């Protein structure tokens, strides 16, 4: 009976020991003998094994809140990491963009500022140069107008000087004088031939040849004189353009007027026709 009464206490004590004390702790009673210690040890081991199995079953049947909490935290952490990865990547990209923009702005301020200043200065210069350029164009136009006005005034002065009589020799004057000089030279040659005939008379053949030459030569001289007079009278007449009368061979001006030269009649007829035309 003593053993039967002690069994429930031992069982309870073994359960308490299994729950309170760490495993593999032996229970011994010093009051009883060595023979009683062995069954108590075996019973304690069996009770401890039963209690550990029950504890394991309870742990398996009952959910562990710590594990669930740890799993939830892991899932949340995974979701947070999964959600934070794109956020972090976007944040990094934004940071990189900001850094790049700040670097670019620094470079622009450091290196490109002179270019901007140059462009601004060029724009300012172009804006300021447009009125300057316009003023320069106006000045050049004014200078051209002044030069033209001066040239016009110079030309008008020349025309006035010509009208007053102060005139330089022109091409027309040189042509007329040259033609008159040639005709006079030809006529003088003819006059010299007639003078020689007086001092040393020629033969009849020489006189006939001289008379043959004299007619066309006098005609040419008269045409030259007529051309000179036409050139003189088509344009405004001047004193130097009036043809002078040719002197006869061995005759004065009065004798020539009384006895005209044989070819002089032709000149008068030609000049009269020219005057009629004019």
UniProtKB/Swiss-Prot annotation:
GO cellular component, one term: nucleus
Annotated region described as Disordered, given as residue ranges: 1-137, 251-278
Major site of localization recorded for this protein: nucleus
Keywords: Nucleus
UniProt feature, compositional bias: Polar residues: 13-31, 78-92, 120-137
Compositionally biased region (Basic and acidic residues): 1-10, 32-56
Endpoints of the signal sequence: none
InterPro entries the UniProt entry points to: FRG2 (IPR026245)
Keyword Nucleus attributed: yes
Location(s) in or outside the cell: Nucleus
Keyword Nucleus recorded: yes
Coiled-coil residue spans: none
Family (UniProt): Belongs to the FRG2 family.
Name of the protein in question: Protein FRG2-like-1
């Amino acid at each position: 009976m003593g053993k039967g009464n002690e069994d429930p206490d031992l069982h309870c004590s073994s359960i308490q020991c299994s729950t309170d004390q760490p495993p593999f702790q032996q229970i011994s009673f010093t009051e009883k003998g060595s023979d009683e210690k062995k069954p108590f040890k075996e019973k304690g081991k069996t009770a401890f094994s039963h209690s550990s199995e029950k504890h394991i079953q309870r742990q398996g049947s009952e959910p562990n809140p710590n594990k669930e909490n740890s799993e939830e935290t892991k899932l949340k952490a995974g979701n947070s990491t999964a959600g934070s990865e794109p956020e972090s990547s976007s944040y990094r990209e934004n940071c990189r963009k900001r850094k790049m923009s700040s670097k670019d702005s620094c470079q622009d301020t450091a290196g490109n500022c002179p270019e901007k200043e140059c462009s601004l200065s060029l724009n300012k210069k172009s804006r300021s140069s447009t009125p300057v350029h316009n003023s320069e164009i106006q000045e050049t136009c004014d200078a051209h107008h002044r030069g033209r006005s001066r040239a016009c005034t110079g030309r008008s002065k020349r025309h006035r000087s010509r009208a007053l009589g102060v005139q330089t020799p022109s091409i027309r004057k040189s042509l007329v004088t040259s033609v008159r000089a040639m005709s006079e030279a030809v006529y003088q040659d003819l006059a010299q031939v007639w003078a020689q005939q007086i001092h040393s008379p020629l033969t009849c053949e020489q006189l006939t040849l001289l008379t043959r030459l004299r007619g066309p030569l006098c005609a040419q001289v008269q045409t030259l004189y007529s051309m000179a007079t036409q050139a003189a009278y088509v344009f405004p007449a001047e004193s130097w353009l009036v043809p002078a009368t040719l002197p006869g061979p061995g005759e004065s001006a009065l004798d020539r007027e009384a006895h005209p030269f044989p070819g002089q009649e032709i000149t008068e007829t030609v000049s009269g026709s020219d005057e009629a035309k004019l």
